[in-house]
């Protein structure tokens, strides 16, 4: 399972993590990256994510870590309450959500991540980190142009 954290201002990947897929790995990796990014910080962060992150435990852990969850809501039930969805920033995050997945799509189509030939978490993790760095380098000319 591959995860990455991204800066919303410029869309560059700032952190990666590869874990064993077990149904909870993405959420655990996201929490680990948040705690590594700002350990003990009281500055409010925002996390934008897809529907797979909409579960009560994950949202509770985010709120305890001073992170606002801008997670896409599940249709039948959602852990995201009305105070979050009514905020104008939530609507903006939902529109920008597509940008989160673009580097992962690039890694699978242009980069070598569609079917890796490596085995082991460390090796695949190194390949994934290198691929995300290449994705950032590919985006830089467009960012510098304006």
Regions found by a protein language model. Give the residues of each.
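Anion-binding and metal-coordination hotspots
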Residues: 1-146
